[in-house]
């Protein structure tokens, strides 16, 4: 163990390698900081998902899929009236709602 420490000390203090060693040390410390920050963010991620889902459930006027009066972009349709404003029903197969200059 003492030999390994002595070798590391000799490499670290050599003048030719001191600048490179500093850069390597800074890089390793930077990666360690990024790893710590990302692990903290991953730990908080499930809490955020729960909070967002609770907020959506608490909204009284949350949009529900069955309340839609029109079909959105790429939705299946039979006529232009099925599609939302500025969308028109494509005349050929597949019949889907697309952007329409006349809609």
Swiss-Prot record:
Propeptide feature: residues: 44-68
Keywords: Disulfide bond, Ion channel impairing toxin, Knottin, Secreted, Signal, Toxin
Localization per record: Secreted
A molecular-function term among this protein's GO annotations: ion channel inhibitor activity
GO CC annotations on file: extracellular region
Domain of life: Eukaryota
Function per UniProt: Probable ion channel inhibitor.
Domain remarks in the Swiss-Prot or TrEMBL record: The presence of a 'disulfide through disulfide knot' structurally defines this protein as a knottin.
Family as reported in the entry's similarity comment: Belongs to the neurotoxin 10 (Hwtx-1) family. 45 (Jztx-60) subfamily.
UniProt-recorded name of the protein: U28-theraphotoxin-Cg1a
Organism: Chilobrachys guangxiensis
